[in-house]
């Protein structure tokens, strides 16, 4: 049972080392990844663009809500 926890700790340590390791041009190795996440984060999208409404969006009926969400009290809520 110690193997999964040890693997998780090693992976997290590697990520923290990579994050802190300076790159010659950008300052750290994961700067580009951080920029990509920041620029491509489109949540929450407008419901018209998505085709359905996400959790906690206002709704009128259950067919408007995405996935397992259901319209309850005028809000898309997880079931």
Curated annotation (Swiss-Prot):
Protein's UniProt name: Beta-hexatoxin-Mg1a
Tissue expression from the record: Expressed by the venom gland.
Effect in UniProt of substituting residue 58 to A: No change in activity
Consequence of changing residue 61 to A: No change in activity
Domains (record comment): The presence of a 'disulfide through disulfide knot' structurally defines this protein as a knottin.
Listed result of changing residue 57 to A/Y: Decrease in activity
Effect of mutating residue 68 to Y: Decrease in activity
Substitution effect: residue 60 to A: Loss of activity on Nav1.2
Effect annotated for changing residue 77 to A: Loss of activity on Nav1.2
Effect of residue 75 to A: Loss of activity on Nav1.2
One GO molecular-function entry: sodium channel inhibitor activity
Function: Insect and vertebrate active toxin. Binds to site 4 of mammalian voltage-gated sodium channels and shifts the activation voltage of the mammalian Nav1.2a/SCN2A channel to more hyperpolarized voltages, whereas the insect channel, DmNav1 (para), is not affected. Competes for binding at site 3 of the insect sodium channel. Causes temporary paralysis when injected into lepidopteran larvae at 8.6 nmol/g. A low intracranial injection dose into mice causes lacrimation, closure of the eyes and sweating. A high injection dose causes extensive lacrimation and death.
UniProt-annotated location(s): Secreted
InterPro entries: Toxin_23
Similarity remark: Belongs to the neurotoxin 15 family. 01 (magi-5) subfamily.
Propeptide: 21-50
Further facts: The primary structure of the mature toxin is identical to that of beta-hexatoxin-Mr1a (Raventoxin-III) from Macrothele raveni (AC P61232).
Keywords assigned by UniProt, alphabetized: Disulfide bond, Ion channel impairing toxin, Knottin, Neurotoxin, Secreted, Signal, Toxin, Voltage-gated sodium channel impairing toxin
């Amino acid at each position: 049972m110690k193997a999964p926890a040890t693997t998780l700790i090693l992976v997290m340590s590697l990520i923290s080392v990579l994050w802190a390791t300076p790159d010659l041009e950008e300052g750290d190795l994961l700067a580009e990844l951080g920029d990509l996440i920041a620029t491509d984060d489109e949540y929450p999208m407008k419901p018209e663009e998505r085709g359905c409404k996400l959790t906690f969006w206002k709704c009128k009926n259950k067919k408007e809500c995405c996935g397992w969400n259901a319209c309850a009290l005028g809000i898309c809520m997880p079931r």
